[in-house]
């Protein structure tokens, strides 16, 4: 395995995942509330692994031949994010919530899994960034497996660090204003 290609995949993976979007905010919230953190991080990382593998090993070509796939994902994702964003904005405006020691109940495991899958698979940028952009960059390297493994490892490191590292931020989120900012 070519280590420079592995680290290239890792650095590209980190650069694409670091922006705090709806999915990362959801992982952060679950980590702050310490509810279903492992399963949320695992779903996000495994989903990324599937998308990275598809992008690196040819799914990007399939999408470029059938752009309707992206259009459907884009519009379904936009609708989901608009509805969820509106709900979060309303909750931020109406709420004075702060983090309590045991965390606020966010629903049962099935609800959390459904939300996590929606944030992951209905996000239009995931296809553009993870599949097409990563796939395009990977097409320029000879050791695609090393590149893919590096990018996949970056996802696992990032999601589990975000989910479990969130507890460090709990004192900050004891203030209702912090939750309002995160919700918005």
Write out the residue ranges for each language-model feature.
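Alpha-helical transmembrane segments and their lipid-water interface positions
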Residues: 47-59, 81-85, 127, 158-166
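Small-residue packing motifs within transmembrane alpha-helices
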Residues: 5-9, 39, 73-74, 81, ...
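Short alpha-helical packing/oligomerization segments
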Residues: 141-157
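Juxtamembrane transmembrane-helix termini in multi-pass membrane transport proteins
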Residues: 3-71, 131-146
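Flexible interhelical linker loops that connect adjacent transmembrane helices
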Residues: 94-113
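Selective transmembrane alpha-helices of multi-pass membrane proteins
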Residues: 5, 65-97, 152-162, 170, ...
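Selected transmembrane alpha-helices and immediately adjacent juxtamembrane segments
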Residues: 109-130
């Amino acid at each position: 395995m070519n280590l420079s290609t592995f680290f290239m995949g890792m650095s590209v993976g980190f650069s694409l995942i670091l922006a705090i979007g709806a999915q990362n905010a959801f992982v952060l919230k679950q980590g702050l509330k310490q509810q279903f953190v492992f399963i949320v991080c695992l779903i996000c990382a495994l989903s990324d692994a599937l998308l990275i593998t598809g992008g690196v090993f040819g799914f990007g070509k399939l999408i470029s031949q059938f752009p309707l796939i992206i259009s459907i994902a884009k519009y379904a994702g936009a609708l989901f994010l608009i509805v969820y964003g509106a709900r979060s904005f309303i909750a931020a405006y109406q709420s004075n919530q702060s983090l309590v020691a045991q965390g606020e109940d966010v629903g049962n495991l099935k609800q959390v899994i459904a939300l996590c899958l929606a944030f992951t698979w209905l996000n239009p940028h995931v296809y553009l960034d993870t599949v097409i952009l990563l796939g395009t960059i990977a097409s320029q390297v000879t050791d695609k497996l090393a590149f893919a493994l590096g990018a996949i490892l970056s996802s696992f490191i990032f999601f589990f660090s975000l989910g479990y590292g969130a507890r460090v931020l709990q004192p900050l989120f004891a203030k209702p204003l912090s939750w309002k900012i995160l919700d918005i």
